[in-house]
Amino acid sequence: MAAVSLRLGDLVWGKLGRYPPWPGKIVNPPKDLKKPRGKKCFFVKFFGTEDHAWIKVEQLKPYHAHKEEMIKINKGKRFQQAVDAVEEFLRRAKGKDQTSSHNSSDDKNRRNSSEERSRPNSGDEKRKLSLSEGKVKKNMGEGKKRVSSGSSERGSKSPLKRAQEQSPRKRGRPPKDEKDLTIPESSTVKGMMAGPMAAFKWQPTASEPVKDADPHFHHFLLSQTEKPAVCYQAITKKLKICEEETGSTSIQAADSTAVNGSITPTDKKIGFLGLGLMGSGIVSNLLKMGHTVTVWNRTAEKCDLFIQEGARLGRTPAEVVSTCDITFACVSDPKAAKDLVLGPSGVLQGIRPGKCYVDMSTVDADTVTELAQVIVSRGGRFLEAPVSGNQQLSNDGMLVILAAGDRGLYEDCSSCFQAMGKTSFFLGEVGNAAKMMLIVNMVQGSFMATIAEGLTLAQVTGQSQQTLLDILNQGQLASIFLDQKCQNILQGNFKPDFYLKYIQKDLRLAIALGDAVNHPTPMAAAANEVYKRAKALDQSDNDMSAVYRAYIH
């Protein structure tokens, strides 16, 4: 295939990872953003998603030449919105060109009329005028506006100077209609975090900093800037403000349902231990976003699917840790987490100075603190990062990540957290994330038990369960969680999205957390008893919504 010449400002179709070709525009990267080594590539701003990425030239195609082809093979609402955004951009550009041409014509007519009125009568003066105009045009070059020489001799400014002031804008200066496609300079980083939950909207102008930007973009800049310390100081200042106001730092990840051009995968080798309901979705998204991943699972057969998708196989946890830079683990409970680290061929045997371990399991604070101590004692770096969500959210890359421990490691995990979740919170020292996660799941588990209790009460009092759900969905309690769990119960579908045995485990640990600080948890304790009854009815491996069966038996 013949090589296609591309340049700054061209509209293109860009292919990123496994995502379909997406319409974008070649733009200038931020000032200090390093270009990846290797093959030639361009910095592309994608329409519709506001994402951006370095794209290899062989993954780019001219927009107009391949428009019909791409529209035929790609479908979906987001894709159509992106194409519509391109067409709107083209219409604005065309309209501006027509307006500019019309204005130029009007100016020319007005100047010609003025020249007719002030034109000298003598032949010598006409020749002087012609020579004078010729000099001006020669100095101004092609495309410059004609200016009357008669007025130039009388005015305070030379024709050339006035013509330069009236000339079109200089190349490189973005037109106002293209402001939403302009890449911010690194100097605008100071204004890039408007708040802990700032959404990623990239609409800079030439004179003001970016506002409401995704703080994950800071990590993208830091990973590729030649002067990360300068950028980091501005970012840290904003983060400190968030910490002072909320007690934590929140980082909003890019919308994982969009084309994640903003996710530049880390060049670090990633390991992942544990391919259960949550771990499987996490690994799948890491691979989709281009990370290099080595997997291990106690049941080796679960690794096969991911090997086919491009993952590497580790024979033991120790081998995975020793061959990877950052190793994540997601297992079921405190005992499994300890066995994984301290057991034969465990994580600890692979830890050397500089190796990083991120435990995503939901465990108690004492367990995670113990694990952190043994990892750090071997020269390793430790981060706890339990996740709030379920299997579907894991598959969709929309988990909420609660992290605590090594702040630098948290920053290093940025692209991984973007791939697997929609939001991440940094909560300070080790143990804080474990406590927060247990509290979150305590609330969720208690709420689920209350939902089941309400549905059964409606049934025994002769009320319609469906009507109860409809009423709840129209009120302040309306949520995806409420609707999904009620639908599970009404349909008798208890396929696990969050195992009942695990929510009961979290309730038990949350109650113990309350006991440790002498804080009463009567609601959680009551809910825990209902889940224990459901487990006795052989519902452990069903979804948490199967707690409903504890009320009807």
UniProtKB/Swiss-Prot annotation:
Site (Required to promote KDM1B demethylase activity toward histone H3K4me1 and H3K4me2): 217
Residue span of region Dehydrogenase domain: 261-553
UniProt DNA-binding region: 168-180
An individual GO BP term: transcription elongation-coupled chromatin remodeling
Effect annotated for changing residue 496 to L: Decreased interaction with GATA4; decreased synergistic activation of GATA4 target genes transcription; detrimental effect on cardiomyocyte differentiation
Gene3D superfamilies, sorted: 2.30.30.140, N-(1-d-carboxylethyl)-l-norvaline Dehydrogenase, domain 2 (1.10.1040.10), NAD(P)-binding Rossmann-like Domain (3.40.50.720)
InterPro entries the UniProt entry points to: 6-PGluconate_DH-like_C_sf, 6PGD_dom2, 6PGDH_NADP-bd, GLYR1_PWWP, HIBADH-like_NADP-bd, HIBADH-related_NP60_sf, NAD(P)-bd_dom_sf, PWWP_dom
Phenotypic consequence of residue 214 to A: Slightly reduced stimulation of KDM1B demethylase activity, but normal KDM1B-binding
PROSITE patterns: PWWP (PS50812)
Chain sites annotated for binding NAD(+): 271-285, 362, 505
Keyword Nucleus: yes
Keyword list, A-Z: Chromosome, DNA-binding, Isopeptide bond, Nucleus, Phosphoprotein, Ubl conjugation
Cell compartments where the protein resides: Nucleus; Chromosome
Residue numbers spanned by region Disordered: 92-188
Domain PWWP residue range list: 8-66
Domain comment, as recorded: The A.T hook DNA-binding domain is required for the interaction with MAPK14.
Functional summary from the UniProt entry: Cytokine-like nuclear factor with chromatin gene reader activity involved in chromatin modification and regulation of gene expression. Acts as a nucleosome-destabilizing factor that is recruited to genes during transcriptional activation. Recognizes and binds histone H3 without a preference for specific epigenetic markers and also binds DNA. Interacts with KDM1B and promotes its histone demethylase activity by facilitating the capture of H3 tails, they form a multifunctional enzyme complex that modifies transcribed chromatin and facilitates Pol II transcription through nucleosomes.
Quaternary state and interactors: Homotetramere. Interacts with MAPK14. Interacts with KDM1B at nucleosomes; this interaction stimulates H3K4me1 and H3K4me2 demethylation. Binds to mononucleosomes. Interacts with GATA4; the interaction is required for a synergistic activation of GATA4 target genes transcription.
Family, similarity comment: Belongs to the HIBADH-related family. NP60 subfamily.
Name the record gives this protein: Cytokine-like nuclear factor N-PAC
Natural source organism: Homo sapiens (Human)
Biological classification of the source: Eukaryota, Metazoa, Chordata, Craniata, Vertebrata
